[in-house]
């Protein structure tokens, strides 16, 4: 028989021509068998087209088929598959079996064959080999012809895998990729389509398998094939840069097939001779079709009415504009939702935001994409049950399993268990029966609550169900037994029953997509287990190997969904838009690198490999360069699919705020349509034409109403006059009535924090003895932010406890060791001058070992990671102690006491602040180290505070109440020196010492002495020192000879005066600071008890308190809200600070 080509560019009416010709055939010969062959994804829409144009009589003798459904039909009528068909999951399992058996014969692929995802790559390559009829022997013969050694290795090993796969496959099964080969054999043996009329539409190219089917059916039937291209004579030369190159190549291959098989050539039909049928109502779209791929091109001179271009700020703005425009078309131009499609090249990035916005705008839509099975709760349950075993009961795997929702435990119990597990660091061996019992017994001894005992019961239930399953799969077992154990485990925890319960709920909520997904997932899992038993039932594998196979199957499983209604906007990928009747099309995300898409992944066979194989007659799928030009055809198809209206858009920023560039398509369209105005949120043409453009559907209109009311409250001019009527409509609407009532509350909302009554605060802040007892650091926290303080110390809010070693834990640990070190030195009467690095190291090591031994449950004993930390702490503390000993050695100050507490009723009395309101506040604290110096009949005090961070004394922060600790400690000691020291004392210094083992950077080699000096300089104490040269020299004798100190922040001139930059203050200034710190503390306490809990975090040039606040999610501080303002810490000069302190103290004295 014969073949006829039907030529026509996009929109020329090829599909309509086919249907009209089919209608004529039906009218003239009602017995004629007619086949309309289209790609798989277009069968549904094509069937609708045929029924709409021809009517029900078309169903009698016209069959709309894809190559796959043709296989099914032929096998049903003629018999076919005598072997069981293997699905993708079984195929992956078979590949895995082949790789395991042939692993010793592989060298190039040996290492990568064990990688996750390699099975998928091989599966895709085998599919490609079969589609392109690649013969194993021909492939193997290439190894003697190719010079590229790497390619030779690839081909040799791929041939081995391919051959072994086919042997195993064909012994018991048939692959879906072999169906077309089997179909070809059936068609040769049975003249099922003899004297039929075959119409082939919507194909761009054909695989060799498909071409073989066309060859066979064209021997006995008339075959009509549509080609989307110009009719070009003598187009033998291949030009891949031509947009139609892939279709021209298809034409040439069919012509060659006809010549070799003596198939007749009917006169072709050329539909390009007249105005494209699709664009009969739009000159602009016809112009785009004609010139979007033509060089040189012509510019459209007419007015622009059918094409829009929108530059969006971001993807949200982009999709919201699309939604508004869809509503406009439906409302004002009588479009149906089914006439409209929204497409993009990166549908995964857009599907969620489209769903949210379209639902808000009440736009019915169908998301034309398959659902990944890997995210289904049943799959998460199965994979995590394996991961618990494979990852040794890690926190992540256990709670991934529990939070699947299918274990039978309620959310409340899971949350409480999670908190308990995090707090106690329960993972790995701690999940065993003995450890759980040990923890339970300890809790009972400590008076465990009923809630805690419930947690242990839940733990035991979780453990028992999983342990029972793990016992059956741990180690090596045959696949049949593992599958059986998994199925019985799912039954035992009633996972399938819960899935059925969810399906009922989804049906009640009319969530059709969810119903379809969950109805399929159970059968997919069981089918996968059946495939595993069928293919690998007797194979012995370990748990990890089976998990890898199972997970690989889940990764590739997708659930297809079909539209649940007829009148819906179709949303999908650009590549799947062909075959639909689309009046209005929205192409979104037209950005550089996205449309046209960039093809980067070459796979196992690179582009160079494919080109070289092609030279030896082995033709595979297109290489990257060819795919890039094929992508141009995808773009051409997208730009020409709409018949009446086209809107193009691109965002300037992605979801993370990163800037995006427009695609080259945008500049091309601008040149073709020079009168096209690029719109944006600032310049929107539709707003000028539509007075009611903000009244769309309830939710977005309600949002616009809020903006209008806000503008009115702020006395801004409102152009629209209809908001009063809109407001009344919402007020009468039952769904929005309560929201309307809350609008004004929201608009007038001042996020500042309300005042709390004094009595309430007193009850919150007083301790068990009925006293207001605070630490200085607490007052500093109030100064940082009153609201944060109230949440932490008033409402007692806490972060979830986690079993980890935090910076505060490190601080406490270091303080304890340094305290123990000082006490040991004092007790054993070791002079600081006798301490060298070795002695320091030995003492510190002994102290840390003793501490960890006494506290066997310490986190530092828990894992190798924390044991390493304890070794590091030994090094850091040893270095710090050696530096302290050197600092003591260089001066004359002596350690008087360490870890001195006041307000504990042990060492010293609390500092008592008497407030103007007559309340008393008792301040407590702990001084890390007190040093004293007796000099010329006077005693000087030096207070040292150890810090594990890089803390520096800042007079500016002191002034604002953010750094009061050192001066409060000094004041407390000086006031109580007669009691503590048995004599009056004077201020000597207040200093911070950083506990660290610094890394010293040098430009070249240095001596040990120079290195020690660098370390001393790096760990130099910082703070304030008495401006007295004798006292300063008593802190570091070296200052006299060197002129600068390696111990304190001071340096001397030759005349004995202090150099600029020395942190020295006079005794009078020390007294001013003491007086000011008392005033500041009283002011802060008074503000606190007056109920001032305003949301006012401090902010300086380095950042704000909010950056490190644990309660920012509670206060919702937002600087864009009028009343939410930072308390700015202005950077003042030292002279300005001293003047301010004096002025405030003088004012205070005047008032009193």
From Swiss-Prot:
Function: The heterodimer acts as both an ATP-dependent DNA helicase and an ATP-dependent, dual-direction single-stranded exonuclease. Recognizes the chi site generating a DNA molecule suitable for the initiation of homologous recombination. The AddB subunit has 5' -> 3' nuclease activity but not helicase activity.
SUPFAM superfamilies assigned to the protein according to its UniProt record, in alphabetical order: P-loop containing nucleoside triphosphate hydrolases
Chain sites annotated for binding ATP: 8-15
Required cofactor names: Mg(2+); [4Fe-4S] cluster
Subunit relationships: Heterodimer of AddA and AddB.
Record-annotated UvrD-like helicase ATP-binding domain positions: 1-338
Any one Pfam family match given in the protein's UniProt record, by short name: PDDEXK_1
Official protein name in the record: ATP-dependent helicase/deoxyribonuclease subunit B
GO MF assignments: 4 iron, 4 sulfur cluster binding; 5'-3' exonuclease activity; ATP binding; double-stranded DNA binding; helicase activity; metal ion binding
InterPro entries linked: ADDB_N, DNA_helicase_suAddB, DNA_helicase_UvrD-like_C, P-loop_NTPase, PDDEXK-like_dom_sf, PDDEXK_AddAB-type
GO BP field: double-strand break repair via homologous recombination
Keyword Nuclease attributed: yes
Gene source species: Clostridium botulinum (strain Eklund 17B / Type B)
UvrD-like helicase C-terminal domain residues: 276-579
Annotated binding of [4Fe-4S] cluster, by residue: 785, 1106, 1109, 1115
Class of enzymatic activity (EC top level): hydrolase
Family: Belongs to the helicase family. AddB/RexB type 1 subfamily.
EC number(s) given by UniProt: 3.1.-.-
Keywords per UniProt: 4Fe-4S, ATP-binding, DNA damage, DNA repair, DNA-binding, Exonuclease, Helicase, Hydrolase, Iron, Iron-sulfur, Metal-binding, Nuclease, Nucleotide-binding
Misc. remarks from the entry: Despite having conserved helicase domains, this subunit does not have helicase activity.
Cofactor descriptive note: Binds 1 [4Fe-4S] cluster.
């Amino acid at each position: 028989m014969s073949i006829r080509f039907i030529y026509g560019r996009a929109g020329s009416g090829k599909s309509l021509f086919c249907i009209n010709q089919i209608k004529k055939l039906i009218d003239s010969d009602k017995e004629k068998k007619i086949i309309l062959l289209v790609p798989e994804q277009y069968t549904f829409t094509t069937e609708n087209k045929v029924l709409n144009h021809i009517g029900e009589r078309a169903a009698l003798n016209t069959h709309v088929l894809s190559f796959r459904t043709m296989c099914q039909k032929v096998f049903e009528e003629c018999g076919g598959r005598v072997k069981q068909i293997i699905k993708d999951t079984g195929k992956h399992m078979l590949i895995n079996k082949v790789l395991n058996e042939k692993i010793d014969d592989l060298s190039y692929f040996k290492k990568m064959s064990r990688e996750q995802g390699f099975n998928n790559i091989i599966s895709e390559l085998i599919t490609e080999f079969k589609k392109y009829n690649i013969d194993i022997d021909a492939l193997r013969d290439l190894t003697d012809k190719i010079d590229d050694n790497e390619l030779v290795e690839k081909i040799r090993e791929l041939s081995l895998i391919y051959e072994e796969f086919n042997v195993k496959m064909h012994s018991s099964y048939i692959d879906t990729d072999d169906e077309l080969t089997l179909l070809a054999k059936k068609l040769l043996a049975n003249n099922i389509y003899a004297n039929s009329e075959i119409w082939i539409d919507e194909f761009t190219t054909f695989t060799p398998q498909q071409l073989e089917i066309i060859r066979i059916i064209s021997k006995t039937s008339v075959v009509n094939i549509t080609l989307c291209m110009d009719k070009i004579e003598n187009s033998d030369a291949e030009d891949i840069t031509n947009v139609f190159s892939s279709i021209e190549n298809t034409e040439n291959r069919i012509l060659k097939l006809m010549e070799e098989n003596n198939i007749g050539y009917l006169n072709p039909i050329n539909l390009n001779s007249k105005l494209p049928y699709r664009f009969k109502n739009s000159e602009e779209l016809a112009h785009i079709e004609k010139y979007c791929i033509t060089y040189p091109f012509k510019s459209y001179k007419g007015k622009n009415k059918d094409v829009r271009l929108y530059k969006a700020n971001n993807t949200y703005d982009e999709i919201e504009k699309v939604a508004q425009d869809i509503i406009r078309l439906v409302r004002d131009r009588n479009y149906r939702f089914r006439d409209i499609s929204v497409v993009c090249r990166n549908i995964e990035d857009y599907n969620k935001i489209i769903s949210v916005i379209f639902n808000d705008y009440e736009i019915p839509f169908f998301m034309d994409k398959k659902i990944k099975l890997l995210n289904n709760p049943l799959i998460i349950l199965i994979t995590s049950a394996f991961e618990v075993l494979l990852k040794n009961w890690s926190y992540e795997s256990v709670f991934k399993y529990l939070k699947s929702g299918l274990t039978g435990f309620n959310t409340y119990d899971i949350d409480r268990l999670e908190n308990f597990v995090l707090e106690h660091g329960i993972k790995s061996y701690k999940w065993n029966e003995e450890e759980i019992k040990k923890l339970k017994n300890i809790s009972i001894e400590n008076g465990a609550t009923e809630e805690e005992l419930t947690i242990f019961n839940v733990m035991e239930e979780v453990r028992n169900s999983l342990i029972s399953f793990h016992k059956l799969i741990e180690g090596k077992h045959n696949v049949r037994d593992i599958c059986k154990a998994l199925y019985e485990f799912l039954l035992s925890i009633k996972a399938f029953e819960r899935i059925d319960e969810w399906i009922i709920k989804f049906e009640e909520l009319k969530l059709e997509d969810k119903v379809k997904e969950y109805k399929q997932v159970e059968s997919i899992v069981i089918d996968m287990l059946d495939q595993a038993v069928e293919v690998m039932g007797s194979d012995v594998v370990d748990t990890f190997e089976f998990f890898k196979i199972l997970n690989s199957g889940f990764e590739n499983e997708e659930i297809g969904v079909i539209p649940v209604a007829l009148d819906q906007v179709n949303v999908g990928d650009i590549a799947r838009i062909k075959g639909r009747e689309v009046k209005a099309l929205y192409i979104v995300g037209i950005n550089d690198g996205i449309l046209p898409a960039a093809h980067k992944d070459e796979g196992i066979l690179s582009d160079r490999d494919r080109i070289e194989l092609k030279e030896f007659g082995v033709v595979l799928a297109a290489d990257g360069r060819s795919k890039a030009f094929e992508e141009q055809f995808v773009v051409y198809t997208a730009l020409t699919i709409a018949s009446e209206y086209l809107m193009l858009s691109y965002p300037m920023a992605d979801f993370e705020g990163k800037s995006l560039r427009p695609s080259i398509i945008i500049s091309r369209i601008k040149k073709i349509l020079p009168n096209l105005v690029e719109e944006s949120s600032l310049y929107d043409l539709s707003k000028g034409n539509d007075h009611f453009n903000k009244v769309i559907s309830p939710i977005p209109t309600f949002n616009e109403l809020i903006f209008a009311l806000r503008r009115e409250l702020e006395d801004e001019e409102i152009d629209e006059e209809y908001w009063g009527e809109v407001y009344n409509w919402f007020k009468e609407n039952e769904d929005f009535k309560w929201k309307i009532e809350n609008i004004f509350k929201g608009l007038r909302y001042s996020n500042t924090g309300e005042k709390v009554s004094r009595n309430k605060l007193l009850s919150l802040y007083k301790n068990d003895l009925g006293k207001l007892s605070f630490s200085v650091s607490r007052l500093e926290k109030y100064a940082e932010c009153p609201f944060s303080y109230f949440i932490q110390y008033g409402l007692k809010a806490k972060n979830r406890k986690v079993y980890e070693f935090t910076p505060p834990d490190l601080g406490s640990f270091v303080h304890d060791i340094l305290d123990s070190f000082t006490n040991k030195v004092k007790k054993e009467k070791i002079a600081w001058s006798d301490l060298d690095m070795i002695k320091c190291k030995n003492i510190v090591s002994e102290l840390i070992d003793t501490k960890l031994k006494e506290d066997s449950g310490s986190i530092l004993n828990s894992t190798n990671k924390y044991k390493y930390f304890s070794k590091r702490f030994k090094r850091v503390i040893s270095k710090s102690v050696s530096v302290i000993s050197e600092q003591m050695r260089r001066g004359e100050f002596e350690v008087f006491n360490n870890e001195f507490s006041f307000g504990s009723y042990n060492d010293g009395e609390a500092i008592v602040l008497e407030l103007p309101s007559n309340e008393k506040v008792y301040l407590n604290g702990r001084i890390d180290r007190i040093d004293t110096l007796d000099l010329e009949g006077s005693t000087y005090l030096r207070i040292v505070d150890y810090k594990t961070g890089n803390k520096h004394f800042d007079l500016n922060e002191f002034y604002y109440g953010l750094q009061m600790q050192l001066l409060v400690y000094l004041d407390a000691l000086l006031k109580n020196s007669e009691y503590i020291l048995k004599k009056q004392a004077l201020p000597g210094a207040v200093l911070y010492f950083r506990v660290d083992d610094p890394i010293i950077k040098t430009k070249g080699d240095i001596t040990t002495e120079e290195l020690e000096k660098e370390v001393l300089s790096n760990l130099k104490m910082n703070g304030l020192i008495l401006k007295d040269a004798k006292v300063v020299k008593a802190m570091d004798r070296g200052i006299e000879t060197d002129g600068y100190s390696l111990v304190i922040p001071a340096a001397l001139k030759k005349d004995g005066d202090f150099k600029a930059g020395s942190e020295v203050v006079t005794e009078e200034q020390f007294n001013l600071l003491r007086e000011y710190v008392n005033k500041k503390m009283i002011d802060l306490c008074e503000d606190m008890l007056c109920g001032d809990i305003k949301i006012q975090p401090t902010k300086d040039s380095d950042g704000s308190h909010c950056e490190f606040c644990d309660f920012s999610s509670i206060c919702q501080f937002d600087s864009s809200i009028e009343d939410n303002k930072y308390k700015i810490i202005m950077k003042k000069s030292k002279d300005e600070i001293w003047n301010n302190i004096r002025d405030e103290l003088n004012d205070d004295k005047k008032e009193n």
